Amino acid sequence: MCVFINYSHTRPYMNAQNKALDELCINTIRFLSVDAVQQANSGHPGMPMGAAPMAYVLWTKYMRHSPRNPGWPDRDRFVLSAGHGSMLIYSLLHLCGYDLSLAELKNFRQWKSKTPGHPEYGDTPGIETTTGPLGQGFATGVGMAIAEGHLAAKYNKPGHEIIDHFIYGIVSDGDLMEGISHEAASLAGHLKLGKLIYLYDDNHISIEGKTDLAFTENRLQRFAAYGWHVQQVDDGNDLEAIAKALAAARNENGQPSLIAVRTSIGFGSPNRQDTAKAHGEPLGDEERKLTKENLGWPQEPTFYIPDEALVHFRKSVDSGLELEQSWTRSFRNYLDTFPEDGARFEKQLKGELPPDWDKDIPVFPADAKGKATRVTSGVVLNAIANNVPALMGGSADLAPSNKTLIDNENSFQAGTYEKRNIHFGVREFCMTAILNGMALHGGFIPYGGTFLIFSDYMRPAIRLACLMKQHVIYVLTHDSIGLGEDGPTHQPIEHLASLRAMPNLTVLRPADANETAEAWKFAVKSNKGPTVLALTRQSVPTLDRSNFGPAELLHRGAYVLKDVDSTPDALILASGSEVKLALEAAEILAKDGTSARVISMPSWELFDAQPQDYKNSVLPEHVTARVAIEAGATQGWHKYVGMNGKVIGLDHFGASAPINELFNNFGITAESLVLAVQDLIKR
């Protein structure tokens, strides 16, 4: 049941003395934000000015956090989805005693500061996720709530609740306009994620003007329809109403909560409050002066922090240590009582792989008919999942095709949070951001599957995973025109090139079953960024490794798969399903007396990271007759074949037809390779 609670008239938050202290603390947040934006001559002052009261209540009355140990496992998480209001969280972090100095606040938006324009995970202690692209923080928080729910269901015992925390966030009008928030809110409501509580900064202002220019639906009814617990606070400065709403949300265990707080952007600014001018530019010296006068704040010094306010905020240091120490005592008791579960929990949180985690991964025998690499991927996934409890994920409603289900494991649903198969629905963008949230929470190696073509829907969240260097695995199947009859709407062309262009992303396109197994091993072990597994729909031969280079060399990005007795006349480079064609071409060429070395190149990124000596051993500089083949865009391959080399690929869209007709008509064939090599040698 979804209940609307409207807090319009409430009693004072506390007595007069405490009320004065509250106002002092709130204005401290406001003017640290105003001064930082003004000094940088860049930024967004309006949101922190309006949202300061609700953030203050949350951080000082409800948030369980430890400024001296921002990574304490059972802390509450806070996601500022409205990342443009970054000075709000920077001010809170400094005031509460995190390792973020006043000098860093004064260095807002400057080179190498810990206070970038939008919050960045890893740069600033206390920042739980990078935000800024609106809507993504909303969905990332859903991922954190899924993580909390799973760990709690798996490890908590009666009287031993070692995982019991909330995921809080502040979301904006812009967040709720973005489509990803619809996806994520729908799934969160379905899953009944009661530990998820979002404060909605309902200020009715966007960059272009009032939100009713483009945003007029009833947001509260929308969230109620999603299955959320919905409340409304009519006055963003009513601390008591905000506190009561948060208390009610915390008590609502069966639904995620949205608290719409009617705020005033740029609060206190005589000429900017409740206008678009307050959103994305400094107030200006004159308006800052008027605002300080209006709210009774001293003009000088800038970045002024009253001692009384700082003392009040810094209580978070001692209270945080007490909370953390209490949890540590509880966990020690848990370890004594449940030593095996406790040890597993510690290793899972630390990201440690169990000994022999890969022991069940098979070595696949040679098979001329073979299997699709997506099918092999499903086998390997299950072999790993048996021994790696941190591996958890699912698909955007394509699990039977992506082969992403963990066998003998039921679905993650309300009431079965201990299970590991997540059904994301047809929500690729939301899925990808949720994976980020799970990884950021800690304790997980999350994975998500869909067709490679739909990585377009995932891209913004993949990009944030790369920016944050998160350990996430993307299982992207149906990776070429090999998809066949579904046609060009579903056949990826430019997608591999697009993904390879993204920093910190490793793209793996394995050629056969054993390369697929090695690709999964890499993806599970690699914790320096996300990994793409690009997998075929169609079957590919499983190579006889007694006759070819070992599949373990996948970890070097490219390797000599089939060599010749003497210096090769030509080099043929290929990835994935086209490796078979490269081998066929080499055999044809050999019959005519042309020796061609075949190089399997599943990962450009891994190969580029190798020592130059190794790269030269695979691609000898003196062999200039080079041809690459891949059933996708040719962009980028000339880095390896040279400007005089040839690339056989597709720089146009596909068509609807059976797979063999497509490959033949588009020239993705062994015969095309042979002609290309012969032409280069003749030159």
Segments (PLM) and residue ranges:
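Conserved acidic/glycine
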Residues: 13-52, 171, 175-176, 197, ...
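Thiamine diphosphate
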Residues: 110-122, 130, 146, 150-153, ...
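C-terminal structured domain segments across diverse proteins
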Residues: 459, 463, 473-475, 480, ...
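Cofactor-binding active-site loop characterized by glycine-rich and histidine/acidic residues
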Residues: 50-191, 405-406, 434, 438, ...
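A glycine-rich helix N-cap at a beta->alpha junction
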Residues: 98-108, 188-201, 224-228, 465-480, ...
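General beta-strand structural signal in soluble alpha/beta enzymes
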Residues: 80, 169, 178, 198-200, ...
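A short, small-residue-rich loop immediately preceding and capping a beta-strand
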Residues: 40, 76-77, 127-130, 160-178, ...
